[in-house]
């Protein structure tokens, strides 16, 4: 190797083997963007201080119960649609004890058109568990949280972080997409959370501001690093983003589009809409005739009854 180095100082030869000088100088590739290093993480946190939305459950003094309700409502539902129902719920049931005293059907009726009404049943069951097993206080421990009805890993982490300021790996789709792009150079995250993603995300959480990073990374993903039309020119960490530096390649994992029209999910939603505003119940025939396909309507009504969302007598359906 040393001889090669010494020979390089002599007359250069071209690739054709002649003694003519080589005119093309060697250039090093540009340095790889640093991704989500500690300085970039701090930049995201600083951006949030002046750009974060004033959502009601983020305000000082918000109870852990209010944070928990906001997280359950926000699952697969845009934040803008959650603010109104969340405000109404907190006025009506400001504590778990308040909701636990109600019938489950009352919670389902108040859920309105947020979608996925099973969440209302689970939230009611969660309130009962908190009232009876935790003296009406939302637990701050992650393991105790995931033992509650309807509380999974994400919601538990969000409550630990947003309600109690604890260190937790909060990974919603917005955070996962931000990490995939800025750190991994990939256009989007996989459809399902992987162990590698969780391990990578855990290493990014700063010790001095874990809760701030959780909410800031989520907000940047929701407002700037969006799924379909990311606003890279407005991004505070554009200079560190590996996906942007690579030219925003179309290299995201393939995602299967979820249909809506004509599905059982749409049918169940129509049936729930018919029954929700009639506390005394609706005739079974009226309920079934709200959907054009009788067999599908009967199947979906049976599913809603089996799941506890509706109650059916011989000729009436009610919450």
Give, region by region, the residue ranges found by the protein language model:
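Residues in the recognition helix of alpha-helical DNA-binding motifs
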Residues: 159, 300-303, 318
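Charge-rich, intrinsically disordered N-terminal extensions
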Residues: 26-62
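Catalytic cores of DNA base-excision repair glycosylases
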Residues: 47-268, 276-295
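Intrinsically disordered, low-complexity terminal tails and inter-domain linkers enriched
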Residues: 2-34
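Short amphipathic alpha-helical interaction segments
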Residues: 291-305
């Amino acid at each position: 190797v040393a001889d090669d180095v010494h020979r390089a100082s002599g007359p250069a030869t071209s690739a054709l083997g002649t003694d003519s000088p080589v005119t093309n100088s060697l250039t090093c590739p540009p340095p790889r963007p640093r991704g989500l290093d500690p300085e970039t993480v701090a930049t995201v946190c600083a951006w949030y201080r002046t750009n974060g939305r004033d959502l009601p459950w983020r305000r000082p003094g918000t109870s852990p119960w209010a944070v928990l309700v906001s997280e359950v409502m926000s699952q697969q539902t845009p934040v803008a649609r959650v603010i109104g129902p969340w405000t109404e719920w907190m006025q009506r049931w400001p504590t778990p004890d308040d909701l636990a005293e109600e019938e489950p059907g009352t919670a389902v009726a108040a859920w309105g058109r947020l979608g996925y009404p099973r969440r209302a049943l689970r939230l009611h069951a969660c309130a009962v568990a908190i009232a009876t097993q935790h003296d009406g206080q939302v637990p701050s421990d992650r393991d105790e949280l995931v033992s509650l009805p309807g509380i999974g890993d994400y919601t538990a982490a969000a409550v630990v972080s947003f309600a109690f300021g604890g260190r937790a790996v909060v990974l919603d789709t917005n955070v996962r997409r931000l990490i995939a792009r800025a750190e991994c150079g990939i256009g989007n995250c996989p459809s399902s959370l992987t162990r590698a993603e969780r391990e990578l995300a855990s290493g990014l959480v700063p010790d001095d501001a874990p809760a701030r990073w959780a909410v800031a990374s989520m907000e940047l993903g929701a407002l700037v690093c969006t799924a379909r039309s990311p606003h890279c020119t407005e991004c505070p960490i554009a200079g560190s983003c590996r996906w942007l530096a690579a030219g925003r390649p179309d290299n995201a994992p393939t995602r299967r589009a979820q249909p809506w029209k004509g599905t059982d999910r749409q049918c169940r939603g129509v049936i729930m809409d018919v029954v929700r505003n009639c506390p005394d119940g609706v005739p079974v025939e009226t309920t079934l005739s709200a959907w054009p396909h009788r067999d599908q309507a009967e199947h979906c009504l049976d599913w809603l009854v089996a799941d506890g969302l509706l109650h059916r007598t011989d000729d009436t359906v009610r919450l």
